[in-house]
UniProtKB/Swiss-Prot annotation:
Protein name in the entry: Lysine--tRNA ligase
Enzyme class: ligase
Catalytic reaction list: tRNA(Lys) + L-lysine + ATP = L-lysyl-tRNA(Lys) + AMP + diphosphate
Subcellular location: Cytoplasm
Cofactor: binding comment: Binds 3 Mg(2+) ions per subunit.
Similarity comment text for this entry: Belongs to the class-II aminoacyl-tRNA synthetase family.
Cofactor(s) the protein needs: Mg(2+)
Pfam families reported in the protein's UniProt record: tRNA-synt_2, tRNA_anti-codon
Lineage: Bacteria, Pseudomonadati, Pseudomonadota, Betaproteobacteria, Burkholderiales
Native source organism of the sequence: Burkholderia thailandensis (strain ATCC 700388 / DSM 13276 / CCUG 48851 / CIP 106301 / E264)
Enzyme Commission (EC) number: 6.1.1.6
Signal peptide: none
Amino acid sequence: MTEPIQPQAAVAADENQIVAERRDKLRALRDQGIAYPNDFQPTHHAADLQTAYADADKEALEAKSLEVAIAGRMMLKRVMGKASFATVQDGSGQIQFFVTPADVGAETYDAFKKWDLGDIVAARGVLFRTNKGELSVKCTQLRLLAKALRPLPDKFHGLADQETRYRQRYVDLIVTPETRTTFRARTKAIASIRKFMGDADFMEVETPMLHPIPGGAAAKPFVTHHNALDMEMFLRIAPELYLKRLIVGGFERVFEINRNFRNEGVSPRHNPEFTMMEFYAAYTDYRWLMDFTERLIRQAAVDALGTATIQYQGRELDLAQPFHRLTITQAIQKYAPSYTDGQLSDDAFLRSELKRLGVDVTQPAFLNAGIGALQLALFEETAEAQLWEPTFIIDYPIEVSPLARESDTVAGITERFELFITGREIANGFSELNDPEDQAARFKKQVEQKDAGDEEAMFFDADYIRALEYGMPPTGGCGIGIDRLVMLLTDSPTIRDVLLFPHLRRED
């Protein structure tokens, strides 16, 4: 007995039938020698016309008699006897085509009636306004430029499955206006950052993506092999040490926007491949960096969105207001006021409290952790997620800041900050350690931690020490997570929403 077809199988069967029918249509086009023409050049874009002639009435458009040539994807078609309409979407927006056999010819009109949604079409004609007030192109020429073999998703439901949206981003971009808006905002934000940096006399540079020694961050690297050199290499986890070599070389202000790779987990805030901007400026410190970073983020919001007041997950956020500044212990006591100064300086209490909060204090990173590292862990458990408004957390312990300059006034503390907005880290910066002997000692400490089982501890980079031995001026450096910044600006709850092609498991 034949089992009934399940709904999902039925949908697949229907789609296969549609694809088969469209392949037949493509075969007919091939037979005619007109399957994929490549000689059409648009003269206008839909959104430009919609903007330029938004207030033009029917009579004004008739008097102007503007001839246009537009191409795009057919998203909607209504065949109504001797007159038909098609909504066409190009890279800028949508506009309506008005098609009649009298204007395009009976043969073209008959062909048009057989075209499918998703087809790439082109038209020449005159801009006019219909009796219902719709800005349209009265087509005098109409062509099919590319046949769509697969049907678009249902216009009312779109791509309902989130993973399908990520996996088939090309379809998501076609049918989801919000997705297109997100990635346009991303491009505007990055362009704004580049201009901001250029206006501040920073030079954009490119440093290696393959490193002989992973460095510049505490992270687990991806490992590969360089066949020509017969050596193990690592996809970079951060460009920091190369950028600071450039400071040594005399380029006093440098920045790079590029990819980093960390062979770690995937979460709403993490993707193993992500975009960072790092910048370094000689003769600055972490206070200068905080002021500069605040202005940069504010300007990126204005350039991408037109305002510094944004909405994120139902709450308003005003980036025009001064960003807060708190130490780690100040933040803990602000959001968990029951902790006393004495408790926050008690090793046994901190370990017990972290264990109560579910932190595994037996892992290698905690075995020899000092008070500062334990305070940071408690901050991450009690305060970090509460930092909704832009807040610089400052004065990080030296034991978790191996590349940062130690404070001149407080032992064991570095001139370092991390910027949090909506409970997420957006930026990390500090006055750079430029003492080669101190840096070498800290690298050795990191190697000891790695030998003890801490996979994220840093390697000893002898060439970087050699560079510092030539002398590096006092320098401030900062890294900004571009993906997380775009999440903030576009009201996106997960990092996958702002990556065109996020990492996914293989399809079965």
